[in-house]
């Protein structure tokens, strides 16, 4: 019952901002949190997941947000999949590099072959702070060269309408 009540509180928080719940986490729950300080190094996969969320948001909204730094992430790791709830700071070069607190949820599924899905990619709900740029920004070096190339052009909406 203790585990169920804890998971209900996590669900009510939407999976984000659950640090205050971790003191009451039952030992049987496979949930963790990680906050980053100015001197911490980011895990490469967390940076890629953060970029995935921003990229999805940019494609849907037609924006150009760019990853500035990762503030924290929570993870839930049951048996077959892992869910990562990432809170990050994105900058908007089209708005004088203003900073936006952003949230994304990426699910990693599979054992031998990984499938990634991103079903939350949004500015953090609530009041936005336009704070100064954090001293510790994302280091691009941990990202593999494979992921640094530009993306192909998005096909036009009528690209698949030909009936041949």
From Swiss-Prot:
It comes from Arabidopsis thaliana (Mouse-ear cress). InterPro entries: MS5 (IPR006462). NCBIfam families: A_thl_para_3677 (TIGR01572). This is Uncharacterized protein At4g17700. It comes from the Eukaryota.
């Amino acid at each position: 019952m203790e585990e169920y009540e804890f998971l209900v509180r996590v669900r009510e928080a939407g999976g984000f901002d659950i640090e205050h719940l971790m003191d009451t986490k039952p030992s049987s729950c496979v949930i963790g949190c990680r906050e980053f300080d100015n001197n911490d190094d980011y895990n490469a996969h967390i940076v890629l997941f953060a970029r995935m969320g921003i990229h999805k948001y940019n494609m849907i909204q037609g924006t150009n947000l760019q990853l500035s730094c990762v503030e924290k992430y929570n993870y839930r790791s049951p048996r077959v999949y892992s869910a990562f709830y990432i809170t990050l700071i994105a900058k908007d070069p089209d708005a004088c590099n203003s900073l936006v607190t952003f949230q994304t949820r990426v699910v990693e599924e599979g054992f031998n072959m990984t499938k990634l899905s991103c079903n939350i990619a949004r500015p953090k709900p609530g009041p936005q702070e336009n704070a100064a740029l954090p001293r510790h920004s994302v280091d691009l070096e941990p990202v593999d060269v494979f992921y640094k190339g530009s993306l192909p052009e998005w096909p036009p909406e009528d690209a698949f309408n030909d009936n041949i």
